[in-house]
């Protein structure tokens, strides 16, 4: 029924629950699961010049967090015997990036949490 499942993650507990749900579905249907982490490359538009974090620092932290989160998700999926992939996607519109990735990989299903962290909230 579901050959390719997409799981957007953000390092939150809610995203971890989505990975767990995707594992159950993947085991039931023999699916491959791809975890993605969307990084907004321009989160500071309209914030002002006195923001304590610079663009380069933000991107370095965001990429490191993406790598850590994706590796944890991939390890969890593989430990459960699920074929797993992982992608970092740059996109100013997270929901659009998720949908575009789902289309590009041929995802049959998107499993995601609804109350994770996002944007500047991660840095606070």
Walk through the language-model features, giving the residues of each.
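Hydrophobic alpha-helical membrane-association signature
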Residues: 18, 66-69, 94
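Structural beta-alpha unit
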Residues: 75-110
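Short, well-ordered secondary-structure micro-motifs
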Residues: 18, 45-48, 96-99, 122-123
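Short glycine-rich, flexible loops that bind phosphorylated cofactors or substrates
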Residues: 14, 94, 118-120
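A short acidic, glycine-rich active-site loop
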Residues: 54-68
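Glycine-rich, Arg-bearing micro-motifs that act as flexible, cationic patches
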Residues: 109-124
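Short, hinge-like loop/turn segments at secondary-structure boundaries
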Residues: 50-54, 102-105
């Amino acid at each position: 029924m579901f050959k390719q499942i997409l799981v957007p993650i953000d390092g939150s507990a809610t995203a971890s629950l989505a990975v767990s749900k995707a594992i159950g579905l993947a085991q039931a249907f023999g699916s491959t699961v791809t975890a993605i982490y969307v990084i907004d490359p321009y989160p500071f538009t309209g914030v002002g010049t006195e923001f304590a974090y610079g663009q380069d620092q933000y991107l370095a932290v965001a990429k490191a967090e993406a790598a850590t989160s994706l590796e944890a998700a991939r390890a969890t999926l593989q430990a459960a015997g699920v074929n797993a992939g992982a992608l970092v996607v740059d996109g100013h519109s997270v929901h659009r990036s998720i949908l575009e990735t789902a289309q590009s990989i041929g995802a049959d299903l998107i499993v995601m949490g609804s109350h994770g962290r996002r944007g500047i909230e991660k840095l606070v």
